[in-house]
Amino acid sequence: HAASPRGRPQQRSSRHGAEGPDTTRRGSCCSSSSSCCRPSTPRHPHNHECKRQLLLLGALLGLPSNTMKYVLVQKKKKK
């Protein structure tokens, strides 16, 4: 059941949630991967929310905050 039928909202893994609602894109994207934290435009509305969720995720995983900050800096340098 991993492969969803075409034309369904579950396609957000390939489209990075661009078609989905705001909360779905922000939640699923930020918690599962950092793709939404590398927006195409510098003034992405969810950028700070992504950073916050990444830090929360790091806290849940038991990672020190400075490690998460380092990861965020590395992701910021990549365009």
From Swiss-Prot:
Q: Which cysteines are joined by disulfide bonds?
A: none
Gene Ontology CC annotations of this record: cytoplasmic vesicle; plasma membrane; rhoptry
The answer to whether keyword Amino-acid biosynthesis applies is no
Is Transferase one of the keywords UniProt gives this record? no
Which residue ranges have biased composition labelled Low complexity? 1-12, 28-37
Compartments, as annotated in UniProt: Membrane; Cell membrane; Cytoplasmic vesicle, Secretory vesicle, Rhoptry
Q: Positions of the region Disordered?
A: 1-47
Instruction: Alphabetically list the UniProt keywords.
Output: Cell membrane, Cytoplasmic vesicle, Membrane, Merozoite
Basic and acidic residues: compositionally biased ranges: 16-25
Q: What is this protein called?
A: EAMZP30-47 protein
Q: Which organism is it from?
A: Eimeria acervulina (Coccidian parasite)
